[in-house]
Structures are given as C-alpha cells and as structure tokens.
Amino acid sequence: MRTPRNRLGAILAWSTAVCLFCSAVNRSHGTEQTTGPAADMVQRLGCQRGICAVLGLPEGREAAFVTELAQGNELVLFFQSPEAAEVAQVRSAAEEAGLLGQRLFVAEGNYQRVHLADNLADGAIVSKSAAQIVKDSELLRVMRPQARTVLPDRVLEKPVADGVDSWSHVFHGPDNNPQSLDRVARAPYLTQFLAGPLFVPMPEVSVAAGGRVFRAFGHISHKANQNAMLNTLICASVYNGTILWTRPLPEGFMIHRNTMVATPEALYLADHRSCKVLKAGTGELMDEIVVPAGIADGPVWKWMALLDGVLYALAGGAEVPVSTQPSTVRGLGHWPWGMWEGHEYKDPKTNFGFGRTFFAMDPATKKVLWSHREDEHVDARGVCMDRARIFYYSPEKFLGCLDASQGRVLWRNDDRDLLAAIGPNERAQHYVTGYATTTYMKCHQDYLFFSGPQRQRLVVARATDGTLLWTKEHGNFLLVLREDGVYAAGPQEPGKGADSPTGYKFAYEDGAVLAELPMRRACTRATGSVDSVFYRAAEGTMRIGTADRSVHHIAPMRPPCQDGVIISDGMLLWGPWMCGCNLSLYGHIGLAPAGDFSFRPGSDDSRLVSLSDTTNVTPLPVTAQDWPTFQGDNGRSSRTATAIPASPTQQWSLDISAQGFPTAPIAAGGLVFCGDHQGRVWAVRARDGALQWKAHTGGAILVAPAVADGRLFAGSADGHVYAYEAATGRPLWRFRAAPADRWIPVYGKLMSTWPVAGGVVVQDGVVYAAAGIAHYDGTHVFALDAATGKVKWYNDSSGTTSPEMDHGVSLQGELSIRNGELRFVAGSVHEEARFDLATGKCLNEPVNVPSSGFPSAYYPYYPEYGPYTSLDCRLPDGRLLCYDASYEGSWQSQLSLLPAAVAAAQPRKPLARWGLQRRGQPPQGLWQKRQAQWFRGFVVHDSALVATGDEEPDAQGKHFLEALAMADGSTLWYQELPGRAVRGGVAINGTGQIFVTLENGQLLAFAQK
C-alpha cells in the first residue's frame, strides 16, 4: 500500500477558497525564474499571474513549449487549436508535467472563435497559423482592458472601454450614494467567474478601480471557514477573479468605515496609525501619510475621501480596541448577532469613527491645505461630500457643512425639529436592521438623506442650509439616489410575503411616492447600476429594472451584507460571503453584461461530432449484479443484488490522479471506470488493476460516467457529452450540450459556463444530460440517442420557469431518474428539477415570488462542504435504512434501520436535510450506528451493507470502509483507508469486488481472500 497523500492538499488544489489565496505581498510569482523562448514570451506579455490564452503552437515548437510557459510564474493557460493531433500532444505534455486541469486547459476549436468569455484573459500568445485566421477584434474581445496579445509580428494591447466607471470609495463615491455611473454593465448578464475566497470574516469593506477590486476583511469569524482571512486585504481582478496579491491588516482596528479609496494606480488604506498608499498592481507600500501633528486629538483616521487629487479626512483619538475572534464552528449557515466590542457607541471620545478635526492634504507633497476643528465630536457614519462641500453630523448636536476648497464653515444647523427628526442613534445589531457601524448619511445635488440601521425614520434635509424637508416612518430604508427618484429598499416586516411592497421610489422635493418596490430581506446594502437597483431578496438577489420596475430574481447568490453588489469596470461583483446564508453559489462572483448573446440558440447539427463508426460496437456484458452508474442505478438507490464479501482485503490500488479528485467508481463487464477532474476517463481491469484504456475530454469530469449497451458515456465540464466503446475506449461521438463554447474560471478551474456538471443517466437507449450552473445563464437539458448522439428532445427554457420573476432551474446536483422523470437538485428556487422523460417538458410549477428556499453546496464545487451522502433505502420487507447529512456537512443523524411501520409514517425530508436537526428526537430504530462516523457512500444488500466515511469530520481523522450486518448493525469487517473517499465513492461488481475512489487520487479494490 502506498503512502497516503495529504488530503487537505488535494482539496485545496481544487478549492479556490484557499488555493487562489496562496499569494502574498512581495512573494515571487511561481517558482524559480526561467529563461528561454517561453520565458521571453511571458516577459513580452508583461503578466505573471492570471489567465493566458495560447492559440496554436508557434512554428517549430513542440508541445513542451506550452508547459514551459507555466514555469516561473503563476499563469493559468488556455490552449486552443483546431488540430486534433496538436491538442492531443499538448494534453499529453500537460499531463506529464502535472499541469493538466490545474494550470493548463486544452480545447479543440477553430481560430475564428476563441472559447473564452469576453474581457477574461490577462494575455494571449498567437501562433503564426492562428494569426492568419483569427481577427484582431476577436482577440480584443477575450482580452481584459490593458492586456497584451503577442502575435508573431507585433503586440496588440486592448484599450480601456468607454463608459466604464470605478467604485473608488466604499459607497461608490464620497457622497455615499451607491449608484454606479458605469454605462457598460447592463442587463442581462452572464457569469464571468466563480472564485475564492468563499467565506470571510466580518466586517468587510470593498473598493474597485482600474480592473481591480480591493477587499478588506476584519476581525470577527463566526465560522471556522472564515479564519484564514482574518485581518486580511486582498486585491483581485474584476474580470476573472484571480487574486493578484494579499496583505495582512493590523489587528485592533475596526475597518467598517470610509477609510479606503481606490484609483487605477494606488490604494489608499487608512487605520489607527496612518494612511498607507499601496501600489495597485502589486500591493507594494509606496508611501505612508500620518495625521499632521497638533491638529487632531490623535492619529486615528475616521473618514477619508479622495477627490480631484486632494485627500480629505476626519481624524481623532484612540478608539475602543477590537480583538481578533477566530471560530471553531463548522458549516455554512447562520451565526449569532450581538453587541460586539465597541458597537454600542457609548462614548464619543472612544467611539468608532468619532473625531473632531477635518483636514485636506495634497497626498503627493503631504502639504496640509486646510484644517478645521469642532468642539463636538463628529460621527464619521454621518459624513459625506460632493464636489464642493463636506457635510457632517454631530449626533443630537448639529448638522454642518464645510467648503471643501478652504475648510470654512458654510452653515451649521441645530434646529430642534431637524435634530428631533433625525433622533438619537438606535441600537441596530440585528439581522433585520443591520450593523451599527453602517454609514447613515448621503448627499445628492441639493439634498441630504439620513437612513440606516440606527435611524428611527428617513429624514431629508436641504443641502444648502440643513433645513428639514420631509420624513418617512421607518428609518432603515436602504437608499439608492438616481436621477429619476429616490429608490428606498424597504425593511423586512414580519408576516409579509417576499413580494410585499415595503419599499418605495420617492420624489426628491417632497417625498411623494412614485412607485412601490418589493420588500428586501434583512440588512444587506442596496446598490444601483445604469439600469437596475440591487438588494437582497427573500434570499438571493433582487434586481429591479428601473425602466419598467420589473422584478428579476438572481436566485443562487445574495449580495454580501456590508458591500452589496459592486459595479466597476463594466462588471458586477458579488461576495465573498461573511455570512452563511443558505444559497447555492458562494464566494467571489463576477457577472458580465451579456450584450447580444443568444441564450436559446436551439439545437442544430453543429453540436454533434461523430468520431468513428457508431453502429458496430464491441459488446461489454453488464449484469444485474454490476454497478453501471453512480450509486448503482439511475434512481441513485445504492442498492445491489451482489452479496457483500465476508472478509475482504485490499487486492490492488492505482493512482488515478496525482492532483486528486477522481469521480466515484462504476463497475461492469469486468472493468472499473471513473473520471477525474483533469478531464480523463479511466477503464481499469477489475481483476488486477491494470489500465485497460484512458481517454481525454476537454474539461473536468465531475460525476461518474455510465455504461450501457457496450458504450460508456461521460459528461464533461467543457459542456460536452462523450461516448466511447466501453471495452476499448474508442471514441464514438461528442455532443455539445452548452449553447456556446464560452469558458470561465469556476473555483480554480477553467470550464464551460454550462458544464455537464450533473453527469449522465442512460435508460432504454437514451442518454440524458444537462448543462449549466446558474438559471440566469440558462439551463440546457437533452435526451440523446445513445447509439448516435442525435437529439431526441431538448429543453432550453427551464432556466426561466417564472417569467414574472425571471428565475428558474439551476443545475446543482447529479442527474437521476425517478417515477418516470429526469431529476436533479435545482439550486434555490426549486428544490428539485423535474422533466418528463418522454418529452422533456419541465414539470416544475412557477414560483412567482422572489425567494430562494432550497439551499445546496454541490460537492464538485464545494468538496469541503458537501461530501456526505444521505440515504433512504427501503428494503423489500418495508424496513428503511436511513442516514441524514446536512447539505453543507455540519450536521448528521445516526445511521439507523427503521421498522416498516415507523418507516411508513416518516414525513418527507428536504433534499438538503437542512432543518432536520430542529425536528427533535429521531424515531427509534431497530439499531443505530454510533454518531461519530460520517458517511460518504453506501452499498446496500438485503443482508448487509458497506459504508465508507470519516471517523471525524476533519482532515486528521481516520477514514474507513466498513461492512455492517443488516439485522443488528454490528460490524462484520472494518478497513482503514489512506484518505477520504469521494462522495458516493464506493461500488461493487457482480463477483463481490468492492471499489473505492479517494479524494487523494487513488482507486482501491477489495476482494474476498
């Protein structure tokens, strides 16, 4: 038996929650710097990290040239060529170098169309043969602004697009109005990237400019998965999510305030010591600015803005220190609110953000242009500015205004009616209201607005003198100030439905109601784009089309609590999450304008490629005792007719993938099959572990293949379904289920926007497959003739089951067939997608409210959260073998055998098993397994079962393969495994051999002595 690999390393290689976080300031890019033609080419690119497209092999170069491009840097390479032989050579070289499916992705395709999303690549290298075909416009399409394409005779650089805007300040601008001026980021959208980190501590503050987003993460972790980012600053590409650099933040400073400003050249980041000026591209410290001596109560930066080259600030004395709070709590969902350190705001002298001195400075020379000191403390949450004036509020004392050019007081208003309307600060710190640290004052043209978690009512005052104009009850409106009116996302109110109108569009001059808006969920910030307003729905994201007030529900993800949806450089950015709300997509997510993209192009002959004779196929005998598909059958029952061996031992092992992550195994006809995340299909002889054949697809294989009628079928993350002669590996046909060849980064890998992520099921000569991730991109479901690959039916409309809400089916689970229906976990809006097997009609009823009620954490994307396999297996006599594990791996029940009468009375369980932990005492079974074990896969026979899993749900625990007697649950035999099994990663064949695939890349076989 070989030495087991470190399982954590295998997981991190796949999960960008950590793998993209591995860089740090001043760390060299990649390994040793190299020399030679490839290194020279990278130097011409001027890019050491990000995504680089490579079109064809340069004249006279071998495939190794492409792998050499990856040396001495951290580039992710996408190679494309129309030549099958060239594609095969590069795949082979990438495989040998350990880069395939990790840092080098290979696609077959002509040069007229590069298979990458718009604005995605950080560089491109074009061979002579490709340069003769591909147009400059196509190269510019896939390049991000300011990226270079190296052609044989020139270098092409993409200019910055007209009409883009930045998100330079925490609330977009110093006016605190979260309304973008970007004219490019228009609906509809397509996913641009899904990236890490997935989860981060609070608070979270973000700004963006020059194609980069800067995110600062604070001091409080409520879940263990947030600890890695405590007190950390990251810089990431807004175009592909690549983390460009990271930097630690000083402990003890509460970051949730306006003290971060981004420009294309620099990030200004202030704290309790100084304002650091960091080089935007590298994080290098270029300068440091301190509060000038003698003008303030101390060195602490309370508020900051940068406008027309002048740095404005509010400074003051030391604040309540905050302590770093890591967590040991597992899982995703929910955390406790409370009055955390300093959040009670009980002393103006030490409150977060309270200061008495404003000043303006030339940041280049550090010359103070002016300073102004107040006797009373000013609350930085109540500070904003337009191009000429700084507005500021001293709680319950006065509202004031400074001339930004000279620092003189323009007016001060302490009118009783005004102060009474604004009122004292409320407590906040509740999931419905939000954070006490939230900014509550905004300005727009001639108006000042007070609203937020701490406010009793919405208050509007005149910007010229502070005169009270109008008020509205409920102070916790989230405002977006647009030219056509004041958009106020209304508070969550108990007992009201998800589509209830608690929000409004108000007129500026008098607060007249111009329109009603659907209720928002809880505390998350509202933001605005050129044509939309975004806020949190009753889970998910609400998008209000401002032209017609139409409702569009983006179901799989919600805006992050303290940032909302950020719009910058023509892109829309979500996450990462500091909360743990139950959704389907997590992490740092980018959406791009779809432009004229055809979401429903229909099906035509171009999708199918016949690769060889499809009629004469070598038979592969499959018996009823075999395991020809994931979890044994199309219903995913994990049942077998094969008797469990009495005392097996390990027969052989095979290293399938050095980088880890094979799929679950299947077994039929004397062979064992699996796929892997490098895009390979493996066929291994069951008797001795010898390789029978191996084939490559274009993308990761995320779910086990299936065998039927002498053919093996696999769904690939490149958006295709592949068919092979199962006995020999001869390719038969390839079918593109994705509507287009459009690759994006998905949690550390490049894959299609529409991967065939749920695997395939085969029944009665028909292969069923689905392509997609998120409903708003479209979900594409096909029934194909198993012999020829020809389309029998297709459904390309289920992504929108409710035109009223513009939401529908996402693809977030393995395909199955039950009750004459094709099914899979549907991601948020619908618990399970359902399609008529004969016609492809979607059977899900429309959900005409903006609600995401069904969480998921699909194992191929989140292997650290969704690895455990729930089981409800009914035996012939009516007894029920059951095990429940929550979708995100934080809770489980005991593995139990229920008597028939008890089993018949069991209520329906949610697929996510979320909420079962609150149902009270589970029913008494005939036997229960000890709860310390966490189960990943099962093989169930009438008299015994085999289970694989973990003794403890952490990387250090033992991992096992165990057989239990069905009669009493006693252990028949127990084998310790050298790593964690993949989800559902156990199979049995007709001779009683048991096969297990491990996340560390091993395939193991066990057989009776």
Kindly label every feature range from the protein language model:
Residues 121-133:
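A short SAM/SAH-binding and catalytic strip from SAM-dependent methyltransferases
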Residues 48-68, 78:
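Conserved class I S-adenosyl-L-methionine
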Residues 11-23:
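Bacterial N-terminal signal peptides
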Residues 41, 45, 49, 105-108, ...:
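Aromatic (tryptophan-biased) beta-strands that constitute blades/sheets of beta-rich domains
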Residues 133-147:
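A short glycine-rich, Lys/Arg-flanked "PGG" loop and its adjoining helix->strand segment in the class I
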Residues 112-123:
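A short acidic, Gly/Pro-enriched loop at the edge of an enzyme's catalytic core
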Residues 89-114:
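S-adenosyl-L-methionine
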Residues 200-233, 249-276, 296-359, 372-399, ...:
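Repeat-blade elements of multi-bladed beta-propeller folds
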